[in-house]
Protein backbone atom coordinates (compact mmCIF):
# COMPACT_ATOMS: atom_id res chain seq x y z
CA UNK A 1 0.00 0.00 0.00
CA UNK A 2 2.81 2.40 0.88
CA UNK A 3 4.52 1.69 -2.45
CA UNK A 4 1.31 2.37 -4.35
CA UNK A 5 0.73 5.71 -2.65
CA UNK A 6 4.29 6.95 -3.18
CA UNK A 7 4.04 6.46 -6.97
CA UNK A 8 2.65 9.69 -8.38
CA UNK A 9 3.16 9.13 -12.08
CA UNK A 10 4.34 6.38 -14.45
CA UNK A 11 4.93 6.85 -18.15
CA UNK A 12 5.71 4.23 -20.80
CA UNK A 13 6.34 5.14 -24.42
CA UNK A 14 7.37 2.72 -27.16
CA UNK A 15 7.80 3.90 -30.73
CA UNK A 16 8.72 1.75 -33.71
CA UNK A 17 9.31 3.23 -37.14
CA UNK A 18 9.91 1.04 -40.17
CA UNK A 19 10.45 2.04 -43.76
CA UNK A 20 11.32 0.44 -47.09
CA UNK A 21 12.61 1.89 -50.34
CA UNK A 22 12.52 -0.34 -53.41
CA UNK A 23 14.11 1.32 -56.47
CA UNK A 24 13.41 0.07 -59.97
CA UNK A 25 9.68 -0.36 -59.36
CA UNK A 26 7.85 0.05 -62.70
CA UNK A 27 4.00 -0.21 -62.46
CA UNK A 28 1.61 2.56 -61.53
CA UNK A 29 0.45 2.37 -57.92
CA UNK A 30 -3.11 3.51 -58.59
CA UNK A 31 -5.14 5.79 -56.38
CA UNK A 32 -3.69 5.69 -52.87
CA UNK A 33 -1.84 2.46 -53.64
CA UNK A 34 -4.96 0.44 -54.40
CA UNK A 35 -3.35 -1.24 -57.42
CA UNK A 36 0.25 -2.21 -56.67
CA UNK A 37 2.07 -3.09 -54.56
CA UNK A 38 -0.89 -3.33 -52.13
CA UNK A 39 -3.04 -1.24 -49.83
CA UNK A 40 -1.55 -2.90 -46.68
CA UNK A 41 1.93 -1.81 -47.84
CA UNK A 42 0.70 1.78 -48.19
CA UNK A 43 -0.48 1.64 -44.57
CA UNK A 44 2.89 0.44 -43.29
CA UNK A 45 2.93 -3.33 -43.78
CA UNK A 46 6.67 -4.16 -43.90
CA UNK A 47 6.70 -7.70 -45.21
CA UNK A 48 9.38 -8.46 -47.82
CA UNK A 49 7.66 -6.70 -50.70
CA UNK A 50 10.82 -6.96 -52.82
CA UNK A 51 10.37 -10.71 -53.35
CA UNK A 52 6.71 -10.26 -54.25
CA UNK A 53 7.66 -7.49 -56.68
CA UNK A 54 10.30 -9.71 -58.29
CA UNK A 55 7.89 -12.62 -58.60
CA UNK A 56 5.28 -10.45 -60.32
CA UNK A 57 7.79 -8.81 -62.67
CA UNK A 58 7.37 -5.30 -61.26
CA UNK A 59 11.12 -4.56 -61.15
CA UNK A 60 13.37 -3.23 -63.89
CA UNK A 61 15.74 -5.66 -65.56
CA UNK A 62 18.06 -2.93 -66.88
CA UNK A 63 21.59 -4.40 -66.92
CA UNK A 64 23.35 -1.34 -65.47
CA UNK A 65 20.81 -0.73 -62.69
CA UNK A 66 22.74 -0.60 -59.39
CA UNK A 67 20.55 1.15 -56.80
CA UNK A 68 20.01 -0.57 -53.46
CA UNK A 69 16.95 -1.79 -51.64
CA UNK A 70 16.84 -0.08 -48.21
CA UNK A 71 14.92 -1.10 -45.10
CA UNK A 72 15.18 1.09 -41.98
CA UNK A 73 14.13 0.36 -38.41
CA UNK A 74 14.01 2.64 -35.37
CA UNK A 75 12.83 1.29 -32.01
CA UNK A 76 12.65 3.66 -29.04
CA UNK A 77 11.57 2.88 -25.48
CA UNK A 78 11.10 5.60 -22.83
CA UNK A 79 10.16 4.88 -19.22
CA UNK A 80 9.48 7.58 -16.61
CA UNK A 81 8.24 7.56 -13.04
CA UNK A 82 7.76 10.13 -10.30
CA UNK A 83 7.89 8.96 -6.68
CA UNK A 84 7.15 10.84 -3.47
CA UNK A 85 8.09 8.67 -0.48
CA UNK A 86 7.57 11.69 1.82
CA UNK A 87 6.08 15.15 1.46
CA UNK A 88 9.54 16.72 1.30
CA UNK A 89 11.19 14.07 -0.87
CA UNK A 90 10.67 13.68 -4.61
CA UNK A 91 12.40 11.15 -6.87
CA UNK A 92 12.16 11.26 -10.67
CA UNK A 93 13.26 8.21 -12.67
CA UNK A 94 13.93 8.04 -16.40
CA UNK A 95 15.29 5.31 -18.65
CA UNK A 96 15.71 5.01 -22.41
CA UNK A 97 16.60 2.47 -25.06
CA UNK A 98 17.06 3.16 -28.76
CA UNK A 99 17.97 0.79 -31.57
CA UNK A 100 18.48 1.99 -35.15
CA UNK A 101 19.49 -0.09 -38.14
CA UNK A 102 19.50 0.31 -41.89
CA UNK A 103 19.65 -2.71 -44.16
CA UNK A 104 20.96 -2.05 -47.68
CA UNK A 105 21.01 -4.69 -50.39
CA UNK A 106 22.23 -4.70 -53.96
CA UNK A 107 20.02 -6.78 -56.25
CA UNK A 108 19.03 -7.55 -59.80
CA UNK A 109 15.78 -8.82 -61.22
CA UNK A 110 15.39 -11.82 -63.48
CA UNK A 111 12.05 -12.96 -64.90
CA UNK A 112 9.85 -14.01 -62.00
CA UNK A 113 12.54 -13.63 -59.34
CA UNK A 114 14.21 -11.03 -57.10
CA UNK A 115 17.90 -11.91 -56.91
CA UNK A 116 19.68 -10.52 -53.79
CA UNK A 117 23.42 -9.94 -54.24
CA UNK A 118 25.16 -8.17 -51.33
CA UNK A 119 23.38 -7.09 -48.13
CA UNK A 120 24.79 -4.96 -45.35
CA UNK A 121 23.29 -3.73 -42.08
CA UNK A 122 24.52 -0.57 -40.33
CA UNK A 123 23.20 0.98 -37.17
CA UNK A 124 23.51 2.55 -33.73
CA UNK A 125 22.40 1.53 -30.27
CA UNK A 126 21.96 3.41 -26.98
CA UNK A 127 20.59 2.38 -23.60
CA UNK A 128 20.55 4.04 -20.19
CA UNK A 129 22.81 2.20 -17.76
CA UNK A 130 24.63 2.59 -14.45
CA UNK A 131 28.35 3.04 -13.67
CA UNK A 132 28.11 4.24 -10.08
CA UNK A 133 30.10 1.30 -8.69
CA UNK A 134 33.23 2.66 -10.38
CA UNK A 135 32.42 6.39 -10.19
CA UNK A 136 34.88 7.14 -7.40
CA UNK A 137 37.50 4.57 -8.32
CA UNK A 138 41.02 6.02 -8.53
CA UNK A 139 41.76 7.26 -12.04
CA UNK A 140 44.16 9.92 -13.29
CA UNK A 141 46.51 10.61 -16.17
CA UNK A 142 48.97 7.99 -14.92
CA UNK A 143 46.84 4.99 -13.95
CA UNK A 144 43.29 3.71 -13.62
CA UNK A 145 42.01 0.82 -11.52
CA UNK A 146 39.06 0.29 -13.86
CA UNK A 147 41.40 0.14 -16.86
CA UNK A 148 43.55 -2.50 -15.16
CA UNK A 149 40.39 -4.44 -14.34
CA UNK A 150 39.37 -4.20 -17.99
CA UNK A 151 42.62 -5.78 -19.11
CA UNK A 152 42.28 -8.54 -16.50
CA UNK A 153 38.68 -9.24 -17.54
CA UNK A 154 39.71 -10.18 -21.07
CA UNK A 155 40.99 -13.64 -20.14
CA UNK A 156 37.81 -14.34 -18.14
CA UNK A 157 35.54 -13.37 -21.04
CA UNK A 158 37.68 -15.25 -23.57
CA UNK A 159 37.46 -18.48 -21.57
CA UNK A 160 33.69 -18.11 -21.22
CA UNK A 161 33.31 -17.63 -24.98
CA UNK A 162 35.56 -20.60 -25.72
CA UNK A 163 33.63 -22.83 -23.32
CA UNK A 164 30.40 -21.70 -24.96
CA UNK A 165 31.83 -22.80 -28.31
CA UNK A 166 32.85 -26.18 -26.92
CA UNK A 167 36.62 -25.61 -26.94
CA UNK A 168 38.57 -27.84 -24.55
CA UNK A 169 40.46 -25.36 -22.35
CA UNK A 170 42.43 -28.07 -20.56
CA UNK A 171 44.28 -28.82 -23.80
CA UNK A 172 47.38 -26.54 -24.06
CA UNK A 173 47.17 -26.78 -27.84
CA UNK A 174 43.97 -24.73 -27.70
CA UNK A 175 45.71 -21.79 -25.99
CA UNK A 176 47.84 -19.08 -27.58
CA UNK A 177 51.13 -17.69 -26.24
CA UNK A 178 49.28 -15.28 -23.91
CA UNK A 179 47.11 -18.05 -22.43
CA UNK A 180 43.99 -17.02 -24.33
CA UNK A 181 41.88 -19.65 -26.11
CA UNK A 182 42.68 -19.81 -29.80
CA UNK A 183 40.04 -17.92 -31.73
CA UNK A 184 39.35 -15.61 -28.80
CA UNK A 185 42.54 -13.60 -28.46
CA UNK A 186 42.90 -10.57 -26.22
CA UNK A 187 42.03 -8.17 -29.06
CA UNK A 188 38.95 -9.98 -30.36
CA UNK A 189 35.94 -7.63 -30.36
CA UNK A 190 33.80 -10.33 -28.77
CA UNK A 191 36.28 -10.39 -25.86
CA UNK A 192 36.92 -6.66 -25.54
CA UNK A 193 33.33 -5.44 -25.39
CA UNK A 194 32.02 -7.47 -22.42
CA UNK A 195 35.35 -7.04 -20.60
CA UNK A 196 35.17 -3.26 -21.07
CA UNK A 197 31.53 -3.09 -20.00
CA UNK A 198 32.06 -5.21 -16.88
CA UNK A 199 35.12 -3.24 -15.75
CA UNK A 200 33.60 0.23 -16.02
CA UNK A 201 30.13 -0.65 -14.70
CA UNK A 202 31.50 -2.66 -11.78
CA UNK A 203 29.93 -5.95 -12.82
CA UNK A 204 31.47 -9.40 -12.44
CA UNK A 205 33.15 -10.62 -15.62
CA UNK A 206 32.00 -14.15 -14.79
CA UNK A 207 28.34 -13.14 -14.99
CA UNK A 208 28.13 -10.24 -17.43
CA UNK A 209 26.15 -10.79 -20.64
CA UNK A 210 28.49 -11.76 -23.48
CA UNK A 211 26.49 -10.11 -26.25
CA UNK A 212 27.06 -6.52 -27.37
CA UNK A 213 23.46 -5.37 -26.91
CA UNK A 214 21.77 -4.81 -23.54
CA UNK A 215 18.10 -5.61 -23.07
CA UNK A 216 16.57 -3.51 -20.31
CA UNK A 217 17.46 0.12 -19.51
CA UNK A 218 18.57 1.03 -15.99
CA UNK A 219 16.94 4.27 -14.83
CA UNK A 220 18.61 7.58 -14.17
CA UNK A 221 17.35 9.55 -11.19
CA UNK A 222 16.92 13.03 -9.78
CA UNK A 223 16.32 13.40 -6.03
CA UNK A 224 15.06 16.61 -4.38
CA UNK A 225 14.76 17.00 -0.60
CA UNK A 226 13.52 20.00 1.39
CA UNK A 227 12.71 18.29 4.69
CA UNK A 228 15.44 20.08 6.66
CA UNK A 229 13.14 23.11 6.79
CA UNK A 230 11.10 21.18 9.36
CA UNK A 231 13.94 21.66 11.87
CA UNK A 232 13.57 24.71 14.10
CA UNK A 233 17.18 25.78 13.59
CA UNK A 234 16.70 25.81 9.81
CA UNK A 235 13.39 27.69 10.08
CA UNK A 236 15.07 30.43 12.08
CA UNK A 237 17.95 30.77 9.61
CA UNK A 238 16.48 30.08 6.16
CA UNK A 239 13.41 30.98 4.18
CA UNK A 240 14.04 27.96 1.97
CA UNK A 241 16.62 25.18 1.88
CA UNK A 242 16.73 22.24 -0.52
CA UNK A 243 19.14 19.52 -1.61
CA UNK A 244 19.31 18.06 -5.11
CA UNK A 245 21.16 15.06 -6.50
CA UNK A 246 21.03 13.70 -10.04
CA UNK A 247 22.65 10.77 -11.84
CA UNK A 248 22.48 9.34 -15.33
CA UNK A 249 24.62 7.06 -17.47
CA UNK A 250 24.40 5.47 -20.88
CA UNK A 251 25.95 2.69 -22.94
CA UNK A 252 26.20 3.24 -26.69
CA UNK A 253 27.41 1.37 -29.76
CA UNK A 254 28.15 3.58 -32.74
CA UNK A 255 28.38 2.64 -36.39
CA UNK A 256 28.07 -1.14 -36.23
CA UNK A 257 27.82 -3.02 -39.51
CA UNK A 258 27.53 -6.50 -40.94
CA UNK A 259 30.79 -8.45 -41.20
CA UNK A 260 30.66 -9.70 -44.78
CA UNK A 261 33.55 -12.10 -44.13
CA UNK A 262 31.50 -13.74 -41.37
CA UNK A 263 28.62 -14.22 -43.80
CA UNK A 264 30.93 -16.11 -46.17
CA UNK A 265 32.40 -18.46 -43.54
CA UNK A 266 31.39 -18.04 -39.85
CA UNK A 267 33.93 -20.59 -38.58
CA UNK A 268 36.99 -19.27 -40.38
CA UNK A 269 39.67 -17.42 -38.39
CA UNK A 270 40.76 -13.94 -39.44
CA UNK A 271 44.36 -12.81 -39.99
CA UNK A 272 44.79 -12.23 -36.24
CA UNK A 273 43.78 -15.81 -35.44
CA UNK A 274 40.36 -14.82 -34.06
CA UNK A 275 36.92 -16.14 -34.89
CA UNK A 276 35.04 -13.70 -37.07
CA UNK A 277 32.20 -11.76 -35.44
CA UNK A 278 28.78 -11.43 -36.99
CA UNK A 279 28.86 -7.64 -36.58
CA UNK A 280 31.75 -5.20 -36.61
CA UNK A 281 31.69 -2.33 -34.12
CA UNK A 282 33.62 0.92 -34.40
CA UNK A 283 33.26 2.43 -30.93
CA UNK A 284 31.79 1.49 -27.57
CA UNK A 285 30.95 4.44 -25.33
CA UNK A 286 30.06 4.73 -21.66
CA UNK A 287 28.93 8.17 -20.47
CA UNK A 288 28.24 9.12 -16.87
CA UNK A 289 26.98 12.39 -15.38
CA UNK A 290 26.36 13.47 -11.82
CA UNK A 291 24.13 16.41 -12.64
CA UNK A 292 24.66 17.41 -9.93
CA UNK A 293 26.48 15.22 -7.44
CA UNK A 294 25.10 17.55 -4.77
CA UNK A 295 23.39 20.93 -5.00
CA UNK A 296 22.41 23.19 -2.12
CA UNK A 297 19.88 25.90 -2.86
CA UNK A 298 19.01 28.21 0.04
CA UNK A 299 17.73 31.66 0.92
CA UNK A 300 18.53 33.18 4.30
CA UNK A 301 16.14 35.27 6.34
CA UNK A 302 18.07 38.40 5.32
CA UNK A 303 17.24 37.69 1.61
CA UNK A 304 20.73 36.43 0.76
CA UNK A 305 20.48 33.53 -1.73
CA UNK A 306 23.17 30.85 -1.71
CA UNK A 307 23.71 28.10 -4.27
CA UNK A 308 26.53 25.58 -4.20
CA UNK A 309 26.94 22.51 -6.36
CA UNK A 310 29.44 19.87 -7.42
CA UNK A 311 29.25 18.21 -10.84
CA UNK A 312 31.20 15.23 -12.13
CA UNK A 313 31.07 13.48 -15.44
CA UNK A 314 33.18 11.11 -17.48
CA UNK A 315 33.13 9.62 -20.95
CA UNK A 316 34.98 6.38 -21.66
CA UNK A 317 35.28 5.24 -25.25
CA UNK A 318 37.10 2.29 -26.72
CA UNK A 319 37.99 2.30 -30.40
CA UNK A 320 37.76 -1.24 -31.76
CA UNK A 321 39.72 -0.25 -34.85
CA UNK A 322 42.98 0.43 -32.97
CA UNK A 323 42.14 -0.85 -29.43
CA UNK A 324 42.86 2.48 -27.74
CA UNK A 325 40.76 3.64 -24.82
CA UNK A 326 39.96 7.34 -24.40
CA UNK A 327 38.85 8.67 -21.03
CA UNK A 328 37.48 12.19 -20.53
CA UNK A 329 36.89 13.35 -16.93
CA UNK A 330 35.37 16.62 -15.74
CA UNK A 331 34.93 18.13 -12.29
CA UNK A 332 33.13 21.38 -11.57
CA UNK A 333 32.65 23.25 -8.29
CA UNK A 334 30.30 26.23 -8.33
CA UNK A 335 29.21 28.80 -5.74
CA UNK A 336 26.52 31.38 -6.40
CA UNK A 337 25.32 34.30 -4.27
CA UNK A 338 22.38 36.59 -4.81
CA UNK A 339 21.00 39.54 -2.90
CA UNK A 340 18.13 41.93 -3.49
CA UNK A 341 18.30 45.47 -2.14
CA UNK A 342 14.71 46.63 -1.98
CA UNK A 343 13.24 49.99 -2.94
CA UNK A 344 16.28 51.92 -4.09
CA UNK A 345 14.99 55.27 -5.28
CA UNK A 346 16.43 58.35 -6.91
CA UNK A 347 15.05 61.49 -8.43
CA UNK A 348 15.10 62.19 -12.14
CA UNK A 349 13.81 65.03 -14.26
CA UNK A 350 11.75 63.99 -17.27
CA UNK A 351 9.87 66.29 -19.65
CA UNK A 352 10.20 69.20 -17.21
CA UNK A 353 8.87 67.25 -14.23
CA UNK A 354 10.63 65.68 -11.25
CA UNK A 355 10.15 61.91 -11.23
CA UNK A 356 10.96 59.50 -8.40
CA UNK A 357 12.19 56.13 -9.64
CA UNK A 358 11.97 53.28 -7.15
CA UNK A 359 12.90 49.66 -7.80
CA UNK A 360 14.87 46.72 -6.42
CA UNK A 361 18.56 46.27 -7.19
CA UNK A 362 19.34 42.59 -7.86
CA UNK A 363 22.93 41.50 -7.30
CA UNK A 364 24.27 38.11 -8.41
CA UNK A 365 27.76 36.64 -8.19
CA UNK A 366 28.99 33.24 -9.37
CA UNK A 367 32.40 31.63 -9.12
CA UNK A 368 33.34 28.22 -10.52
CA UNK A 369 36.36 25.97 -10.73
CA UNK A 370 36.29 23.53 -13.63
CA UNK A 371 38.85 20.82 -14.33
CA UNK A 372 38.89 18.38 -17.22
CA UNK A 373 41.43 16.22 -18.99
CA UNK A 374 41.48 13.59 -21.70
CA UNK A 375 43.72 10.53 -21.48
CA UNK A 376 44.40 7.93 -24.15
CA UNK A 377 45.33 4.53 -22.69
CA UNK A 378 47.13 1.80 -24.61
CA UNK A 379 46.05 -1.76 -23.84
CA UNK A 380 49.35 -3.27 -24.93
CA UNK A 381 51.83 -0.78 -23.48
CA UNK A 382 52.01 1.06 -20.18
CA UNK A 383 51.67 4.33 -22.06
CA UNK A 384 49.02 6.84 -20.96
CA UNK A 385 49.01 10.13 -22.83
CA UNK A 386 47.17 13.31 -21.87
CA UNK A 387 45.93 14.76 -25.15
CA UNK A 388 43.74 17.57 -23.89
CA UNK A 389 42.57 19.25 -20.71
CA UNK A 390 42.45 22.44 -18.73
CA UNK A 391 41.82 24.01 -15.34
CA UNK A 392 39.52 27.03 -15.49
CA UNK A 393 38.46 29.67 -13.00
CA UNK A 394 35.21 31.40 -13.95
CA UNK A 395 33.64 34.43 -12.31
CA UNK A 396 30.55 36.48 -13.10
CA UNK A 397 28.90 39.45 -11.41
CA UNK A 398 25.69 41.18 -12.49
CA UNK A 399 23.59 44.01 -11.13
CA UNK A 400 20.22 44.79 -12.70
CA UNK A 401 17.77 47.60 -12.03
CA UNK A 402 14.36 48.32 -13.57
CA UNK A 403 13.81 52.01 -14.29
CA UNK A 404 10.25 51.32 -15.41
CA UNK A 405 8.12 48.41 -16.57
CA UNK A 406 9.70 48.81 -20.02
CA UNK A 407 13.25 49.97 -19.32
CA UNK A 408 15.93 48.06 -17.41
CA UNK A 409 19.70 48.24 -17.13
CA UNK A 410 22.24 45.50 -16.38
CA UNK A 411 25.88 45.86 -15.41
CA UNK A 412 27.95 42.71 -15.95
CA UNK A 413 31.52 41.58 -15.32
CA UNK A 414 32.83 38.22 -16.58
CA UNK A 415 36.25 36.77 -15.81
CA UNK A 416 37.82 33.50 -16.93
CA UNK A 417 41.30 32.06 -16.56
CA UNK A 418 42.35 28.78 -18.19
CA UNK A 419 45.54 26.82 -17.73
CA UNK A 420 45.94 23.96 -20.19
CA UNK A 421 47.17 20.45 -19.43
CA UNK A 422 49.49 20.22 -22.42
CA UNK A 423 52.62 22.36 -22.62
CA UNK A 424 52.01 23.57 -26.18
CA UNK A 425 49.07 25.73 -25.06
CA UNK A 426 49.52 28.98 -23.16
CA UNK A 427 47.38 30.11 -20.20
CA UNK A 428 44.55 32.41 -21.21
CA UNK A 429 42.69 35.15 -19.35
CA UNK A 430 39.48 36.72 -20.65
CA UNK A 431 37.63 39.69 -19.16
CA UNK A 432 34.31 41.04 -20.40
CA UNK A 433 32.46 43.92 -18.80
CA UNK A 434 29.81 46.40 -19.84
CA UNK A 435 26.32 47.77 -19.43
CA UNK A 436 23.22 46.49 -21.19
CA UNK A 437 20.14 48.68 -21.55
CA UNK A 438 16.96 46.82 -22.49
CA UNK A 439 13.70 48.40 -23.58
CA UNK A 440 10.57 46.30 -24.09
CA UNK A 441 7.83 47.51 -26.44
CA UNK A 442 4.29 46.71 -25.36
What are these regions (language model features)?
Residues 1-442:
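Exposed, low-structure sequence patches enriched in small/polar residues
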Amino acid sequence: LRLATMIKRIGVSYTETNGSMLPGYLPQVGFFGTSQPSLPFVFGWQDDIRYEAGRRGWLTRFDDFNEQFIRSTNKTLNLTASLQPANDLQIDLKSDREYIDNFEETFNAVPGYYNPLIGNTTGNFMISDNMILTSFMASDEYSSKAFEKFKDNRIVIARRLAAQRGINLSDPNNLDADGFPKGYGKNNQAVLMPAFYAAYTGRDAEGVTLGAFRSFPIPAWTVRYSGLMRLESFKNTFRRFSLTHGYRASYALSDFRTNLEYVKNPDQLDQGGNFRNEKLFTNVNLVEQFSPLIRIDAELQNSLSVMGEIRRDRTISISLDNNYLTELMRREYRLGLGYRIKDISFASRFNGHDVIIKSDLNLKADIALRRDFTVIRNMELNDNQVTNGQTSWLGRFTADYSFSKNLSGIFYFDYSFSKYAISTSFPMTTIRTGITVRYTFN
